[in-house]
Amino acid sequence: MLVEGELFKIAEEIIPLASLDNKNIEIYISEINLSARGFIRSIANILEKGAVVLIDYGFGRDEYYHEQRNRGTMMCHYRHHAHDDPFYFPGLQDITSHVDFTAITDVAVGEGLELLGYTSQAQFLINCGITEILSRIPVENTSDYLPMANQMQKLVSPAEMGELFKVIALGKDNQQSLIGFENGDKSFLLEKDM
């Protein structure tokens, strides 16, 4: 639920990010995901001990408000075609936008959660052993190996989902190390803006 005046407070935080001196743009459009804030608050209220791992496509604040994204990140998908007009096929198309992982972290920390890790999907899956799973299949067994290798490539390739998708872990009183963040943890990218 949006508390009265909260939208203006959020906008005041974002405006300086979208209008940095080095940007030569007149208009900057951006999405504000108000429901994500409520979602993170509900996790913080429910979670007593442990970790929550979230995977989605998005960026930390510096990348999210880059001048290349001065028209926002919203994309529409209809029958394997992508475009940016939400009124083209209303009710029939998927409408998506990227996650501002710094905003997620800000709300999480403000609600008593800890940032336990942040990295790319590729690094997370490699840390969790995806390459070891593939190595169990003999390369000579092409009918099993090739489909699995193609699926893994889609998940970890920088040109596919590997770098665009990010993984963030938030928690309370978590005593266990999270293997997915042992190498390549980029939490510092989110913490520097806090």
Predicted regions and their residues:
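Short phosphate-coordinating micro-motif centered on Lys-Gly-acidic
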Residues: 1-13
